Design a protein with these regions (language model features):
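Conserved small/polar residues in nucleotide/adenosyl-binding loops
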Residues: 206-213
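Short, flexible micro-motifs
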Residues: 112, 181, 212
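Buried, small/hydrophobic-residue-enriched core segments of structured protein domains
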Residues: 2-69, 148, 156, 160
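Catalytic-core "active-site belt" of small-molecule-metabolizing enzymes
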Residues: 29, 33, 37, 142-205
Length: 217
């Protein structure tokens, strides 16, 4: 995938995971074998296995493979693989601007920004969406017309916690059921998997001077 860093330099990054998934999604036999693995029950079972102490051995291997500096986090040893992915970063590594007129970033990731209008589309991991097709709520989609969609894509090396972007109150939350394809965009080059994936979002009413937001998709 291509990225642009903060200095405007273009970075092309292809991982071993990208290569493996491209093989899986471009061959009929492997796609058929993969179907049972996409079921929510299988995903839940995998989650339980990655909560075991035995799975903790993969945390250090993963950190080294992806150049993750564990000294930036509050602890360097983990009880499980999932414990590693929910690790908490040291406060000084993510200073927060608390001015009422500022929206902070909700998470680490690669950022794209799109205007929201009636016939407009924006892209999430190579998949085109309208506001309505993403959140499946026509009334709420109309509310955001004229605004901006800020899409932040986390990759495996990013910090996997997120926060609200300003002070306020969560007023609405919705889960859209679906299946559990990989979130790697390589797979989406073969078929539009993200429109089939389960997802969840919430609406936040802010008490600061910042605009209201749709969060967590």
């Amino acid at each position: 995938m291509d990225y642009m860093d903060r200095e405007g330099h273009r970075i092309k990054k292809t991982t071993s995971q990208d290569k493996f998934l491209k093989f899986v999604y471009t061959h009929t036999a492997t796609r058929v074998l993969m179907r049972p693995l996409l079921l929510p029950a299988v995903s839940r079972l995998g989650g339980k296995l990655l909560n075991t102490k035995v799975s903790a051995v993969f945390a250090g291997l993963f950190a080294r493979a992806h150049g993750i500096d564990l000294n930036k986090y509050e602890k360097q040893k983990f009880d499980s693989y999932n414990d590693f992915f929910t690790r908490k970063i040291k406060a000084e590594e993510r200073p927060v601007n608390r001015e009422d007129t500022v929206l902070i970033s909700p998470c680490d990731g690669k950022v794209s920004v799109y205007p929201i209008h009636e016939n407009g589309r924006f892209f999430i991991k190579h998949t085109p969406y309208t506001t309505h097709s993403l959140i499946r709520d026509a009334k709420l989609a109309r509310h955001y017309m004229g605004g901006w969609a800020v899409v932040i894509r986390l990759t495996v090396d990013d910090y996997h916690r997120y926060c609200y972007v300003a002070d306020g109150e969560k007023t609405y939350q919705r889960r859209i059921p679906g299946i559990f394809h990989t979130v790697n965009p390589i797979a989406n080059d073969i078929c539009p998997i993200y429109k089939m994936n389960s997802r969840e979002y919430c609406c936040l009413l802010y008490t600061s001077d910042a605009a209201d937001e749709l969060d967590g998709v």
